[in-house]
A protein has these predicted regions:
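Topogenic membrane-insertion module of multi-pass membrane proteins
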Residues: 1-82, 89-98, 117-126, 132, ...
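Hydrophobic faces of alpha-helical transmembrane segments in multi-pass integral membrane proteins
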Residues: 29, 33, 55, 59, ...
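Flexible domain-boundary/linker segments
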Residues: 29-36, 41, 76, 80, ...
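Membrane-embedded alpha-helical segments of multi-pass transporters/permeases
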Residues: 31, 35, 107-111, 133, ...
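Helix-loop junctions at the membrane-solvent interface of multi-pass transporters
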Residues: 36-37, 112-113, 133-134, 158-159, ...
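Short capping loops/turns at secondary-structure boundaries
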Residues: 112, 119, 133-144, 166-174
């Protein structure tokens, strides 16, 4: 009994590592943030939309991570032999089946509910496939990954007639920067991707801060002098400072460990970007659930890798 329980626990752990569980949680924050930002009067009865929305984001992210490791099987055998598929803890065929089911079921949940966001979910699923199977190792790889996360954010925004593409574009740009940096996290030894990646991230954060202060992004009675605006922009500034601090260490010592730390910080910072935006537009109380999401993702990331 003990041996069987132990094997079962190790199998579950392998699957949680495969899907990058901390990142799955940050994916839920993307779409939920989009919904909350443009629906400031949301109430508990909106859970019939919020729960499927979060579920779709998490399913598509998990499916994408599984497909990532299926596609990179040969590379991981040489560079990351301890990962679930090359180590034999998860069968490649099982991971491929899981990815295929997730990429169909995810958009299907919103389509079943006749939500307009289902069209965006389908586009996101297609983008996930294109990134993992064709674009990842090309010059378009970072742009494709940024598009995936931008679409995930846009999926929540689409529930409002006020939605625009500016916020998801700027958010996706930040992910482009993370992805640029991640390309050197295995080999290390070069700052060729780190510096441009950090510059892209800073440009994205500046754009997000500016968009949060624009008239179209806030309720009619919002005033830029309000405390919530200062606090929200300060949170975005803190994200920038944290990235630059970790980035400086990676520049000084461009080893795999320091670069992986920079990438991990960037991934977990995605939730804080949402916290900053929601705080600036709607106030701190509306952002508290997203702080809780970050705490959960951070605690899990101490045990499971997020990149």
């Amino acid at each position: 009994m003990t041996s069987g329980t132990s094997r079962g626990g190790l199998a579950i752990l392998a699957w949680l590592q495969l899907v990058r569980l901390p990142g799955v949680i940050t994916a839920a924050a993307d779409s939920l943030s989009g919904y909350v930002l443009l629906n400031p009067g949301w109430q508990l009865h909106d859970w019939d939309r919020l729960i499927p929305l979060a579920a779709v984001s998490m399913i598509l992210y998990a499916a994408g991570m599984a497909l990532n490791d299926v596609a990179d099987h040969a590379v991981d055998q040489a560079e990351r032999p301890g990962r679930p598929i090359p180590s034999g803890r998860v069968r490649r065929s099982h991971a491929a089946l899981f990815a295929a089911i997730g990429l169909v079921v995810g958009p299907g949940i919103l389509y079943w509910n006749r939500e307009i966001a289902s069209v965006i979910a389908m586009a996101l699923a297609a983008c996930v496939v294109a990134y993992n199977l064709w674009l990842k190792h090309t010059s378009l790889g970072p742009l494709a990954m940024g598009t995936c996360r931008g679409l995930n954010f846009f999926m929540g925004l689409a529930y409002s007639p006020l939605c625009g593409v500016e916020l998801p574009l700027a958010f996706g740009l930040f992910v482009v920067g993370i992805t640029m940096i991640s390309r050197s996290e295995v080999a290390g030894g070069s700052i060729r991707e780190i510096v441009p990646g950090l510059i892209v991230e800073m440009a994205a954060l500046a754009s997000l801060g500016a968009l949060a202060l624009m008239p179209g992004s806030r309720p009619a009675d919002w005033d830029p002098r309000h405390f919530q605006a200062i606090l929200g922009i300060s949170i975005l500034a803190a994200v920038a400072i944290a990235q630059l601090a970790v980035g400086w260490r990676a520049i000084r010592s461009p080893e795999p460990k320091t670069i992986q730390k920079l990438v991990k910080t960037g991934v977990l910072s995605l939730v804080w970007i949402h916290v900053g935006l929601i705080t600036a537009v709607l106030g701190p109380p509306a952002a508290l659930p997203f702080v809780a999401l970050w705490v959960v993702a951070f605690l899990i990331a101490r045990r499971l890798y997020a990149t």
